Amino acid sequence: RHAVAEITSELQVRNGEGIQEDGSFHQHGRQLQLGNYGLGFLQSMSYWNRILAGTPLAFPPERTEALRHLVLNGYRWVIWNGRFDLLAQGRQIGRNSQTGKAKAALRAIAALQKADPESGRLYAEILRQKTPFTGNRHFFNSDYMVHRRPSWYASVRMNSTRTVPVEDRINWENALGRYFSDGVMLIMRSGDEYRDITACWDWTRLPGTTLPATPILTEQECRELKIKEASGKTPRWTLSRHWRKTGESEFTGGVSDGTRGAAV
């Protein structure tokens, strides 16, 4: 019983790391992490919610409600035609990440559906992925907007003095993605538009952005040019910024009426 109490204590909407009021998930500061740490959180919580359902150790209703909020107001929005939005994934955006993370999230939602029949119809709609719902949602805690129409999907990822940009060059993941949360806008129809694209992108010319043509130098090139970090070490890549630091602009945000929205 004590162990279950410890597990479920994390299932609450909070201002710090974890589930946010807007349905997003933060980790490593005020940073959108639905496809990385948030996905692991969803998988673990859905698993234990299903295992313990119908027993004296079942999750309290308010804890299940927090998990339901994360799914219906978060994950439901960022999966399109079986693909996870790259902009919501965090730093793990490598090969097959969109389909792999979408499958993992949908499996977790299927487990939650068994434990939370009260919202079974809504979970079933997410799992079908054939008749995507429409609407607009601004994730105000995360500087992120999603717009869904019957035949296409669009999203914008931003950062401000209130949020942390997507982390880069951590465990060699997203090594070139310094600007990936600087106003990038992605549009999907089939869902395959960005499949395995990260190895081919010019990371100083990302869609939706106006970026400086900053040269990207490898570790070998940095060594030859004697470029050093503040610590004195040779950088692995030059196109990087210290993670867990908030953005620099206050003029970032969005408005939404649930159908239409605007982001800047």
Each model region followed by its residue ranges:
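Active-site lining segments of carbohydrate-active enzymes
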Residues: 1-58
